[in-house]
Amino acid sequence: MLKLIQNNREITALIAILCLFGLLSVIDHQYFSLQTVTLVFSSAQILILLAIGATLVMLTRNIDVSVGSIAGLCAVIMGMSLNAGFNLPVSCLLTLLLGMCAGFINGALVTWLKIPAIVTTLGTLGLYRGLMLLLTDGKWIEXLPDELKRLSAPLWLNISPIGWLLMILILAMAWILAKTTFGRNFYATGDNLQGARQLGVRTDSIQIIAFSVNGIMAALAGIVFASQIGFIPNQTGSGLEMRAIAACVLGGISLLGGTGTVIGAILGAFFLTQINSGLVLLKLPAWWNDFIAGFVLLAVLIFDGRLRCAIEKISANKNMPVSSKMTKVIR
């Protein structure tokens, strides 16, 4: 039973989502509807993108706490390039390239210079955030063109063009990780680094790719942010890194690497966003968001630790010789 829970964390996250829907529907009978699902999905798009990127990094037994700053910096570059007269496709391309470069720098520092990921990304968190503020002089970027805002305008089934593209991206990432050798290399790298190297996996390249894709996802999150609200505040992306990590852990991505699925991380992101909508429904202040995200992260980590210890204890008892078991009983 315990192994079933450990190996099917996506189902656990889905049950949590349905239970929360049920609870909030008791408070407001109109809450449980297709319109609510699409609204929560729209609000969750930024966190989902960050969770996809964080999944790859965490699968390789690393962590990136700079994604919020990368998303903010990329949103600023997006806004500045549009206001400078560049068209939307060119601005998006520049933004994605910047995100990839920022992620590549993180990956290179971790793999080539052997600096721990948490230390590296704490440093680049401040670096990218400071660069963002230097570029904007601490001011907001406004007057973004309508063509950018149309990317987040509801289209078919009340889902925006970005929403449909995101669903295609989710399916593609899930297929790559589950069905391809390239995707399984991320699991192998995080599960047993030395063993993966002996099997011929280019673990350094895999880790750099994970960080680079994470940067691209953060850049996409920055584009979505700018598209949804139509301007770019000077604190864009602040605090998103913790929520992305919490979403992944909630969805079954292990901080020890090599375990979890991108679908689980996305369900975790949806659940955290759903909590936000619940706070609005209950008319609670917005600053409860970070408290709840931190609480959920700690609770899931404690649960994971206790679950892992229980499974290891059961396995040890099963593998214990009969004579040893009898000796324990006699004592």
Curated annotation (Swiss-Prot):
GO terms for molecular function: transmembrane transporter activity. One of its GO terms (cellular component) is plasma membrane. Pfam families: BPD_transp_2. CDD domains: TM_PBP1_transp_AraH_like. Keywords: Cell inner membrane, Cell membrane, Membrane, Transmembrane, Transmembrane helix, Transport. The keyword Transmembrane helix applies. Signal peptide: none annotated. It is found in: Cell inner membrane. Its main location: membrane. It comes from the Bacteria. The chain crosses the membrane at residues 14-34, 39-59, 70-90, 93-113, 115-135, 157-177, 206-226, 252-272, 284-304. It is a multi-pass membrane protein. The complex is composed of two ATP-binding proteins (LsrA), two transmembrane proteins (LsrC and LsrD) and a solute-binding protein (LsrB). Belongs to the binding-protein-dependent transport system permease family. AraH/RbsC subfamily. Part of the ABC transporter complex LsrABCD involved in autoinducer 2 (AI-2) import. Probably responsible for the translocation of the substrate across the membrane. This is Autoinducer 2 import system permease protein LsrC. It comes from Photorhabdus luminescens (Xenorhabdus luminescens). The lineage of its organism: Bacteria, Pseudomonadati, Pseudomonadota, Gammaproteobacteria, Enterobacterales.
